[in-house]
């Protein structure tokens, strides 16, 4: 089993970025003014304080519920699965309530820096809707996992792993189809023409490009690829098309997102999820077994604590994989557009418009960054240009 896991991981790890590619050293001061670097650093510093504090508060809530679980379980009288669901919902709700001050602080910080146009009421509504989704998801997951644990005391984790992987695949197919109902077609003739050309170059002719209207909520610019099979799509935020980004920079974005699809990054992400889900479920089973197993409702809050700890511990690995695929999409974009100058301009503008730190601290990079740093991305553009004989 370990050999099969290793072979699968090795195959998924491979990318089209040349194995011997060496990124040149780049100095952020060559691309950003001192004022731009200071502003981005100041903005990110607040977020780097907020995240550890929010994480500590979250785990405090989870530990509290894990300790109180047995007493609360005895007071419900709803049966094992019903009691487990109640304890899980209470835990999720408590965690959401504890996160509220941090969410509002983040909204205040974004508004202070001109990045958010949403009101505090909008932020509260979004948190409420998120909580409803989390509660519904919790109802489903606890019902299934506890039923498996009660039926298969020692091997339930295998069935739970299958359930989570199947759920991940289903959501990857269904959610994009539902989300596409709120998207707009790409009505910019020049951008649409560029998209068709780049889709042909990258082999993504069958993937549509849509626009998501977010200008009333944020000034940030972004784009993303999502979906599997018939639901695959590239989505541009309308803020990317508001005149702040050049035609060449938008072409780089399009090629990058097409690269995610043509290099099967979303499917590979699900494959990694499967590879780590089963060991994660085994660890959960072993740790909860010491407290009587997940067949017992009183263990549910403790199980949520363990799952959260596993997720926190896996963040560095998840980010390494994400950054690797993002780098490959950058390489695809450079190969398709053959315009390293536009790529450098895009990465620079991402910082000046979104206040992203071009060169974050190492701990932040390891724990929080899903993309290569902006300086690493600029360095890759330089490396591509050098490999092509100077580039542009």
Give the ranges of each region predicted by the language model:
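Polar-ligand-bearing catalytic/cofactor-coordination segments
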Residues: 2, 9-66, 73-294, 308, ...
């Amino acid at each position: 089993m370990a050999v099969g896991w290793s072979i699968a991981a090795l195959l998924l790890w491979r990318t089209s970025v040349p194995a011997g590619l060496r990124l040149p050293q780049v100095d952020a001061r060559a691309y950003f003014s001192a004022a731009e670097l200071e502003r981005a650093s100041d903005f990110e510093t607040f977020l780097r304080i907020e995240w550890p504090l929010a994480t500590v508060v979250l785990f405090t809530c989870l530990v509290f519920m894990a300790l109180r679980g047995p007493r609360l379980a005895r007071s419900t009288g709803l049966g094992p699965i019903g009691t487990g669901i109640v304890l899980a919902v209470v835990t999720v709700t408590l965690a959401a309530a504890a996160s509220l001050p941090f969410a509002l602080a983040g909204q205040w910080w974004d508004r202070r820096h001109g990045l958010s146009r949403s009101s505090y009421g909008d932020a509260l509504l979004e948190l409420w809707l998120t909580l409803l989704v989390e509660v519904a998801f919790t109802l489903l997951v606890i019902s299934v996992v506890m039923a498996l644990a009660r039926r298969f005391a020692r091997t339930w984790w295998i069935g739970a792993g299958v359930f989570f992987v199947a759920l991940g695949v289903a959501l990857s197919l269904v959610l994009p189809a539902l989300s596409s109902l709120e998207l707009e077609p790409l009505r910019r003739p020049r951008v649409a023409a560029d998209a068709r050309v780049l889709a042909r170059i990258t082999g993504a002719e069958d993937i549509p490009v849509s626009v998501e209207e977010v200008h009333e909520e944020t000034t940030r610019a972004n784009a993303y690829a999502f979906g599997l099979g018939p639901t695959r799509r590239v989505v541009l935020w309308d803020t990317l098309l508001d005149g702040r980004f050049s035609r060449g920079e938008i072409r780089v974005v399009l090629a990058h997102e097409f690269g995610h699809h043509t290099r099967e990054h979303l499917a590979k992400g699900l494959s990694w999820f499967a590879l780590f889900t089963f060991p994660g479920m085994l660890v959960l089973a072993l740790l909860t077994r010491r407290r009587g197993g997940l067949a017992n409702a009183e263990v549910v809050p403790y199980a949520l604590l363990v799952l959260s700890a596993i997720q926190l511990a896996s963040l560095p690995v998840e980010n390494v994989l994400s950054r690797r695929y993002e780098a490959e999409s950058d390489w695809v974009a450079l190969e398709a557009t053959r315009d390293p100058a536009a790529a450098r301009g895009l990465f620079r503008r991402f910082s000046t418009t979104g206040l992203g730190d071009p060169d974050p601290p190492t701990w932040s990079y390891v724990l929080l960054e899903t993309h290569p740093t902006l300086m690493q991305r600029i360095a890759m553009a330089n490396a591509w240009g050098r490999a092509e004989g100077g580039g542009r």
